[in-house]
Amino acid sequence: FLGSIIGALAKGLPSLIALIKK
């Protein structure tokens, strides 16, 4: 369960960083 949450977080992190950097 926790692994899937971390996986989803890792997948969404790049887009999140891109949003912050813009």
UniProtKB/Swiss-Prot annotation:
It is found in: Secreted. The modification Lysine amide is found at K22. Keywords: Amidation, Antimicrobial, Secreted. The keyword Secreted applies. Its main location: secreted. The keyword Secreted applies. Expressed by the skin glands. GO terms for cellular component: extracellular region. Belongs to the frog skin active peptide (FSAP) family. Brevinin subfamily. Antimicrobial peptide. This is Brevinin-1OKd. The lineage of its organism: Eukaryota, Metazoa, Chordata, Craniata, Vertebrata.
